Amino acid sequence: MGISSKNGPKKMGRAKTFTGCWTCRGRKVKCDLRHPHCQRCEKSNLPCGGYDIKLRWSKPMQFDPYGVPIPQNSPATTTNLSGSVDEPQYQRRNIDFVRYDEEYVYHEDMDDELTMLHTPPIEKISDNKTWIIKKFGVFKGTDKIDKQYAPRKKRNRKRVAKSLESSASISLSSLPSSSTISFPIRHIEDKLRNKGHVKTGILSANDGVPPTPNLLDYDWNNLNITGYEWISSELRDDALLSAVTLQGHHLGHTQPQEISLEENSNVVSGEEHVNAKEHGCAFEADNQGSSTLPNKAASANDKLYQQNLKLLFQKNSSNSEEPDPQALIDDVFVNIEPRSLPASDLNKITLAPPNEESRMPKSMLELTSYSSDLPPELVDIIPKTDLTVHGLARFLLNHYFNNVADKMTVVVLEKNPWKTLYFPRALMALGDLAGLGQSSNSRNALLNALLAVSCFHLQSKYPRNYKLQKYFLGLGIELRNQASNFLRLCLNTKSSIPEKYKDVLTAILSMNSIDVVWGTMADCQDHLALCEDFVESRMKLRPNISEKTKTLHRIFSFLKLIQDSTALDKVRAKEIVILPSEEDDNYKPLDTSNATTSSSEPRVDVVQEGLFREALNENDGKIHIEFVKEPITNVSADSTPSSTTPPIFTNIATESYYNKSDISKLVSKTDENIIGTDSLYGLPNSLILLFSDCVRIVRHNEYYNLTYLPVPRKFNELSLNFEKRLLKWKSEWNFHQENSEGKSFINSTAEALYHHTMSFYFSLIIYYFTMARSLNCQFLQNYVAKVLDHLNAMEELVDQKKVKIVPLIWQGFMAGCACTDENRQQEFRRWAAKLAESGVGSYWGARQVMLEVWRRRKEDEPGDNWYSVYKDWEMNLMLS
């Protein structure tokens, strides 16, 4: 900018150059540019700064609890650890911007390259080398490691080797002890065979190859995986727990390593002690030159965590063959004749799948030798193996029956299916193993699944890094892996032991329970889709089912409905019954009247005019609801209705869960802790009918959007008719009773059920208007406030009156994502955290989605709704 003088012409200001030495530039004087040191600095007796390019390290990004980056110039980042203000950043204006011939097209390409560079192999950056992948590179920095990100070392290998030589207090093999726990390690069995050590499941002492890092050696309080800092701090532990469990689940061909729960408490046998002595010296010698092994282990562990965190948020394309449900159904009904075991097989007890990918931990079930004296004539006849059920197995089964099964339903039930159907079949598996030496793959899968659910539930009750938390976590990983292997065998291979339909169905549904408890819901969609095809194949072969089977169908139907409400992008063409056609131009209004009785439109929202009844669809085995147009007092549970109102979509089954019993007897007046089996999920039948029809409407609407089809007129009219039913709905359940003071709730449980029902109803209104009508959330804040009030009232009953009720997270999630008020958002956040403490699972995925919706809405970013986040993260949501 020019400077004007009073008397003379304007003088042009000197242009600033950026070619001088750093000292002259700092003094803002002209530099003579002499190399290697300028003459002006020498004359001034100043050290010349030279002409080299100066780079400055950028500070790591920090995020607030909502995942929003904190600006570098904020007070939280402008001071260093010593309290002084950091120097300003230099700008390299004398260096041209880099221009590449090839630019990135997708962010995923850049993320993949940066992920590889984040954990470089040691040989790529050794000897001051720089590893470059296309546009980015990495080199080795300081040797000082930040200990908060490094895995904790529990013991020194040299000390272990010396102690092995001096005493026999530490075992190198798996012991038949009830205090051992299994953790997976890769490629161990082959190494042991090659070196001649086949007795144990642990790496031999003189094997110099580093094992896969221990899954649980990390300090969970300080762990921060690069690239996933946006995960909320309150949910990071649960996310990492899911990643750890996923790591244990996806390890292929693993051989468990037995680790003692109580250190220094094992006693080794003489043979094991000799083996330890033989290999102790070699073990110590190998450690002399293995200083890089801990770094490799940490690097490998970081990479595993990143890979599995990526699996949590992105789709996992499996290369395994999909099972054929029809072939399995044929096998179920063909192999119904009694089996007989040859005498040669009586000594064999099958506790693990034959593929050796997993095994039953010896701390629960163990094979022992029969030591009783027998007559010589019976030595070759009587089996020589026994099955010992340790106290840990009984403890886990007892914990499941008393503490976990009741939380699978919204309210405590007198006849809980998880106690009357699931649990007895797990005990049958134990009986088969003890009596016959083997059980069906489905029962084995169910037994391991129930034990895994108990372990995951128990580990959530202990603080992070606590010994028992790691113990039950590792045990649950192994049991979940084994349950998955048994189920895979059940679905893909034919066994000599016949499978029963209810056994297979409970095994598949139990895997869904594990996914909810252990935190990730990635496999729920696959398990429910498999279950759907399996049930349909069964109904084609034999449509008549028992009451127990119908109960399992009800459980599946409701879980599938909950899953379908969020997995809208997974809609299948067979679900669509209303397609656009040429008849739309001449379309007449849909006649919803009942042709068999009268021409008046049925008012299904008025309970005095009829009864909502359960009906079984013989084509796909799902449960749907019929509205019987007769007074409740004149209709018995088993009578044939004279007129019915079918679901809104007559060609598909509207899923529900309900029993054929009088609605007026739903809430027991005498016992406030026990509710009838009609109310597994604490919702009236008419509300589930509305929920099912609403989900079908939303899925139809999404199918039209995905396939670029015009919306049929018939569908628009059906939607309007449903909207009227939704807004006029009234519950058929009687929550109140008349007394001298007016109306009051029957009991505390009835009051809690009322709040649960109304919170779900108002959330259903929010779900319909946001997903089917694309209404802005600002117009629904009245319903959001009502949902929050009912949830808080229900929570108050649980805390003060000890009402046994575990609400669904569905209504809180839908209302929370639609909430725009920051104070109410914090209330929803607190409610979800409280539900995670009292319920079965942590629901960290749904809670993180809710936080992301609020962040986008606050920053005025596009896609500030749960469905956009669901699609962006490719994350499955199971809100049961």
From Swiss-Prot:
Residues 21-48 bind DNA. It is found in: Cytoplasm; Nucleus. Its main location: cytoplasm. SUPFAM superfamilies: Zn2/Cys6 DNA-binding domain (SSF57701). GO terms for molecular function: DNA binding; DNA-binding transcription factor activity, RNA polymerase II-specific; transcription coregulator activity; zinc ion binding. Signal peptide: none annotated. InterPro entries: Fun_TF, OAF3, Zn2-C6_fun-type_DNA-bd_sf, Zn2Cys6_DnaBD. GO terms for biological process: arginine metabolic process; positive regulation of transcription by RNA polymerase II; regulation of arginine metabolic process. Keywords: Activator, Arginine metabolism, Cytoplasm, DNA-binding, Metal-binding, Nucleus, Transcription, Transcription regulation, Zinc. With ARG80, ARG82 and MCM1, coordinates the expression of arginine anabolic and catabolic genes in response to arginine. Interacts with ARG80 and MCM1. This is Arginine metabolism regulation protein II. It comes from Saccharomyces cerevisiae (strain ATCC 204508 / S288c) (Baker's yeast).
